[in-house]
UniProtKB/Swiss-Prot annotation:
The lineage of its organism: Viruses, Varidnaviria, Bamfordvirae, Nucleocytoviricota, Pokkesviricetes. Multifunctional protein required for genome uncoating and replication. Major viral uncoating protein that is required for the release of the viral genome from incoming viral cores containing the viral DNA genome. Possesses an ATPase activity that is required for hexamerization and uncoating. This is Uncoating factor OPG117. It comes from Vaccinia virus (strain Western Reserve) (VACV). Homomultimer; hexamer. Interacts with OPG148. It is found in: Host cytoplasm. Keywords: ATP-binding, Helicase, Host cytoplasm, Hydrolase, Nucleotide-binding. Changing residue 503 to A: Loss of NTPase activity, no effect on primase activity.
Length: 785
């Protein structure tokens, strides 16, 4: 700092309130005078009834001042209350000033607090009916511009504080050409109350805010930008209502006419004082008139009407300009791509690092609150009102027109805290995961510290898996299908076949189910047998509706199909359950289309029986056999003599509890990912095993025996006629009786009689009432000479 401004001992004073600007500028000795401190003190002694008001001589040339405050409380505090209040007052205002100085001036927070709390002077009013004083912080210097900029901060402190002294700070003194009554002088000649000095400060310079005497203990700060630079080039923002409408609202508030109304425009309305024609009392405070004019300011998206001079002498009025503010808030939230509309008409919300449905709980409202602090200050305060939040939420819903396709990342596994790439093992979180729009997840957080191969849990898990599906040459094909099926549960795409887990009781099917449920969490759903045995239509079907976007569906405990009255598995249902879209809606909902990403596993102790068998069905069925029995010690001997089991193991009574406590969650998940990369990269492959279904034996074999007749077989008719074939309607046909004779050479009628009859009924045709035929040719009849 320049040495010229480190000191000022010439005190410029006004001799009365309301000195005309011209007299002040010309330094008319009738109204103004300049003193050295000792001269000022003698002048007051010689003129005890004088009225002196300290002010800066020329703010443009020199505006260094001490931080000062004027406190005026219309109540008298007793000594104890006063001491407590003044102590809290010093702490509050020093903290407030230090925060402002740090934020706006780049000052050192601790240094400001230290300089303010270590050295200050207090005056005391001789008026016994009130508590009034001036406080001068002797070693804390700033500029008048800085004090003016600090006015709002101190005003907010004054309004929010519970301290009566803090609430009584007069912020009106922070203005251009401000004045402060000199200690020991009167406010006017008729007023006999004055402010007196208090120990330990007995020098008049300690009570003057324009006196400057900087030393090593002093601290100075000022605005990093001038007030003029802080004013934006254009005050009126596009989101506001029109300026004309806003000024009309201001005019209606005053009731009395504004004489210079037509002089106001978008660029000057904050600097031009309002000239009011007080025909009637002030509409704000009901006083007959005001000496100082009202003025307008623009704050937080609203016009603020306040009175210059002492602002507490009239009410402050706010005129909101938020014609489209709530709409703008909704638009800003939409711009973050944190709320989307799915193709099913659902709203999904990006919150806490994952996409979630806005269904059971109001997640859009939670999102609005969570990003409130990321919005500009003028918007964030609006969201504290529940009614306005609801309006913003409604705006967001109305503005979302274009739907987005979700869950199109089959090789990504979503968690509560991010997304796991199944191919390369990368885990994406935060904004990196946001681009993978997945509406369902495992429901738990991914923990990379547990997602490792070498762990005690992995060792225990491998022993469990190897017991359920042994790694033997005889079981190699079965084990491979077991691994393929379970790892396909990670994939978010439609699977081409259903898998039956077939085996006697206590062979590890339910253990596998619980391990899978633990590993993929909410992506697993268990359903009933009705999805296999009942007609699937567009009616209410919560079992089908719950399959939407799930990656594994487990259907347990099929009935014993040998029992009378039990329903067979519907072939049509199997076909529908391998389609990308499954029809079925929840109760009280019209959403009937469910995206089918599930690996459907059917846990059964009985061989499956179908109502109808064809090639389409056989291409959609795979079977994993379970032949290791887990037995109690008492039943082990009987189990070892049962041909249904290859091995018998002792049952681990504590295993179920460990699985329920998710001990093997990340170990099994690691294993599933490993199998996924082994079998399903780059293409997911899940093949049927129709040869494992006894009921398919006839259809698998007959497909190797017969071909449909066609025109290319007509030239062979000479040889075929000798073998019982006839030509009917230009098609080679085989009479029914002849077909039955030929087919009996390949199939035992006692074992396959029902299948033969079913095949005939499905394919036979009628020449007339009594003659029946089939349009099939035995392969051996056209291949043999």
């Amino acid at each position: 700092m320049d040495a010229a401004i480190r000191g000022n001992d010439v005190i410029f004073v006004l001799k009365t309130i309301g000195v005309p600007s011209a007299c002040r500028q010309n330094e008319d000795p009738r109204f103004v005078e300049a003193f050295k401190c000792d001269e000022l003190e003698r002048y007051i002694e010689n003129n005890p009834e004088c009225t002196l008001f300290e002010s800066l001589r020329d703010e443009e040339a020199y505006s260094i001042v001490r931080i000062f405050m004027d406190v005026d409380l219309d109540a008298c505090l007793d000594e104890i209350d006063y001491l407590t209040a003044i102590q809290d007052f010093i702490i509050e205002v020093s903290n407030c000033v230090a925060r402002f100085a740090f934020t706006e001036c780049g000052a050192i927070h601790e240094n400001v607090i230290k300089s303010m709390r270590s050295n200050f002077s207090l005056t005391k009013s001789t008026n016994r009916d009130k508590t009034s004083f001036h406080i001068i912080f002797l070693d804390t210097y700033t500029t008048m511009d800085t004090l003016i900029a600090m006015k709002r901060t101190l005003l907010e402190l004054s309004r929010s504080s519970e301290n009566p002294l803090t609430r009584s700070i007069d912020t009106a003194v922070y203005r251009r050409k401000t004045t402060l009554r000199v200690v020991g002088t009167r406010k006017n000649p008729n007023c006999d109350t004055i402010h007196v000095m208090q120990p330990p400060h007995d020098n008049i310079e300690d009570y003057l805010f324009t006196y400057v005497d900087m030393n090593n203990n002093s601290y100075y700060f000022s605005l990093q930008q001038r007030l003029e630079d802080l004013v934006p080039d254009k005050l009126w923002e596009p989101g506001f209502i029109s300026f004309e409408d806003a000024i009309k609202r201001v005019s209606k508030i005053f009731i009395n006419s504004i004489i210079n109304f037509n002089d106001l425009d978008e660029n000057n309305f904050t600097t031009v004082p309002l000239v009011i024609d007080y025909v009637t009392p002030c509409a704000l405070c009901k006083k007959r008139s005001h000496k100082h004019p009202h003025q307008l300011s623009l704050e937080n998206g609203a016009i603020r009407i306040y009175k210059t001079g002492n602002p507490h002498s009239c009410k402050v009025k706010i005129v909101p300009l938020d014609g489209n503010k709530l709409f703008n808030i909704a638009q800003r939230i939409l711009d973050t791509n944190s709320v989307l509309l799915t193709e099913r008409g659902d709203h999904i919300v990006w919150i806490n690092n994952s996409w979630k449905f806005n269904s059971e709980e109001p997640l859009i409202t939670k999102l609005i609150l969570s990003i409130r602090h990321q919005l500009p200050k003028e918007y964030s305060s609006e969201l504290l009102c529940p009614r306005k939040r609801k309006t913003v939420e409604a705006n967001i819903r109305d503005m979302l027109v274009d739907s987005v396709e979700t869950d199109t990342y089959p090789d990504k596994l979503p968690f509560k805290n991010g997304v796991l790439d199944l191919v390369d093992g990368m885990f994406y979180s935060g904004d990196d995961a946001k681009k993978y729009t997945c509406t369902v997840s495992t429901g738990f957080k991914f923990d990379d510290t547990k997602f490792v191969e070498d762990s005690p849990e992995m060792e225990e898990l491998m022993n469990i898996i190897n017991d359920i599906q042994p790694l033997t040459d005889e079981n190699k094909k079965n084990r491979e299908l077991y691994e393929k099926t379970l790892s396909s549960c990670l994939c978010g795409a439609t699977k081409g076949c259903l898998t039956f887990f077939f085996g006697e009781t206590a062979t590890g099917k339910s253990t596998t189910k619980r391990l899978l449920k633990s590993a993929i969490g909410d992506l697993f759903v268990e359903t009933g047998q009705t999805i296999l045995t009942d007609v699937l239509d567009k009616g209410p079907n919560p079992f089908i509706a719950n399959m939407h976007l799930k990656r594994s569906v487990f259907c347990s405990e099929l009935p014993d199909f040998a029992c009378s009255g039990s329903k067979k598995i519907r072939s049509d249902n199997i076909k529908k359950l391998t389609e990308p879209c499954v029809i079925g809606r929840p109760c009280f909902s019209n959403k009937i289309n469910n995206r089918n990403h599930a690996t459907i596993i059917i846990d059964t102790n009985y061989k499956p029986v179908f109502d109808r068998i064809d090639n389409a069905l056989m291409r959609r069925i795979a079977v994993v056999r379970f032949r290791t029995h887990f037995s109690q010690p008492s039943g082990r001997e009987a189990a070892e003599n049962n041909d249904a089991y290859d091995k018998v193991k002792l049952l681990d009574e504590g295993l179920d509890g460990k699985i329920q406590n998710n001990r093997y969650r990340f170990a099994f998940l690691y294993l599933l990912v490993k199998w996924y990369r082994k079998y399903h990269v780059p293409i997911m492959k899940l093949y049927p095993t129709p040869e494992e279904i006894p009921d398919f034996a006839f259809y698998l074999k007959i497909g190797t025996l017969l071909v449909s007749s066609s025109v290319k077989h007509i030239p062979l008719m000479t040889d075929l006629s000798k073998k019982g074939y006839i030509l009917y309607d230009n098609v080679v046909t085989l009479p029914l009786t002849t077909f039955q004779q030929k087919i009996s050479k390949y199939f035992n009628s006692r074992l396959f009689g029902h299948d033969i009859e079913s095949f005939i009924n499905r394919h036979k045709k009628f020449a007339n009432v009594s003659d029946e035929y089939l349009q099939y040719i035995f392969i051996e009849d056209i291949s043999s000479p």
